[in-house]
Amino acid sequence: MSSIRNASVKKLLSEFKRLSESNPEKYDEFITQFNRPLKEGLYSDFSNRDTLLELIRFKSTELEGFTSLAAYKERMREDQKSIYYLAGGDEQTLRKSPLINAYKNKGFEVLIMDDEIDDIVIPTVGRYDDIELKAINKSSAVDDIKTDEDKEKEKAAKPVLKKIKDALGDRVKEVVASSRLDESPSCIVVDENDPTVQMQQMLKAMGQTELPEFTPILEINPDHPVIKRLAEIDDMEMISDISTVLLDQALLAEGVMIKQPVEFVQKLNAILSKTL
């Protein structure tokens, strides 16, 4: 029975592939209904993983509608090292993430993975056609875009980084100068082997309340006026308030519910009252 089932699955996937090649528009209609089951197959049907990788589709920063991994690869820049993606949230939130701009500015396409299963399945895939699939909200993804100038800015920012880390304590794993922010003062990422903050939130909502707490890494933009002003401040209460707002607004920007929304508003109001 198992061999019959396997043969049937392979034949069905072959028909899907034929449809995707012969009638892409009709296949896109099909994918709106069956993209998720195909993605689930990546996790549960290893023998057909290569075929499934050709069949699944994603949204992208470069075009409307869906794209395949194969089409993404064809559009890659010659100096591009990885297939970049961002998962964990609805499409609108992901597209507005401050993490995306640095990659777009360098001409790197980012796949928008707005299905909650993406954050679970895609990390298990690892590579497509020998190219690494890299989440841009992981700490190591910045290595692909970091410049020597960024490294110099990081050295110069050490005093303000320490201020923020001392203020936030164990709410963050570390505070680092960002190479991927231009307009925003801060963003959050996670260590390579840690689940994203969005995944942690999703798993807890599903009832897995005994998960260990993985703290995020806070990245700050050394060129942003808020960070430059913070570097000049000695008022410990103000430093604490600004640091908390920098973290909480970074979480909110990624669609994450903050633990103390009332405290966030109070600290934001305190900052406004002292600066206006």
Explain the meaning of each model-derived region:
Residues 1-276:
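Conserved GHKL (Bergerat-fold) ATPase module
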